[in-house]
């Protein structure tokens, strides 16, 4: 019977520290992995170059890193970027970056579909299917950040924290 690997980004820093201790390793390895996942946006264990190959292989044995894929991107002449984002389960959401003269706004999806019936909104025509996981919200911001060359000063960790709190 095949075992399904757990998405490592569903673990808290404390969970990661405890995992490494159970494996007979130092707890600080959990801090290193957490930093790779949430500050450096690593999508592969091989990217975690300050970990030994053995440690990376052990992580690969126990976990996966589910991530999104920008399936289509549209850029308008005013600089707006709209991404159709494919989630790890194949569902699609959208994220948009809207630059103006005074500020730049990033709109990211927090759920697939919507339970409201706003007439002006295309998403409202979709049946609400599920809330996004914190990592799926985070990945949308990372994707927008990479495309726009914007520098988001610490909002990624704040967004992640908010998403975890909201999840409970």
Residue positions per predicted region:
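Flexible, acidic/Gly-rich N-terminal and inter-domain linker regions that tether
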Residues: 1-104
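Conserved Radical SAM active-site core
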Residues: 91-95, 101-110, 115-168
């Amino acid at each position: 019977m095949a075992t399904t690997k757990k998405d490592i980004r569903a673990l808290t820093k404390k969970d990661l520290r405890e995992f490494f201790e159970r494996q007979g390793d130092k707890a600080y390895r959990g801090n290193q992995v957490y930093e790779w996942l949430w500050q450096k946006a690593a999508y592969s264990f091989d990217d975690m170059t300050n970990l030994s190959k053995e440690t990376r292989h052990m992580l690969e044995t126990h976990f996966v890193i589910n991530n999104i894929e920008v399936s289509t991107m549209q850029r308008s002449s005013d600089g707006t970027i709209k991404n159709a984002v494919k989630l790890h389960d194949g569902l699609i959401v959208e994220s948009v970056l809207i630059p103006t003269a005074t500020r730049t706004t990033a709109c990211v999806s927090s759920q697939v579909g919507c339970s409201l019936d706003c007439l002006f909104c295309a998403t409202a025509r979709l049946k609400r299917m599920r809330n996004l996981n914190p990592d799926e919200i985070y990945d949308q911001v990372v994707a927008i950040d990479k495309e726009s060359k914007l520098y988001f000063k610490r909002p990624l960790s704040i967004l992640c924290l908010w998403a975890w709190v909201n999840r409970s």
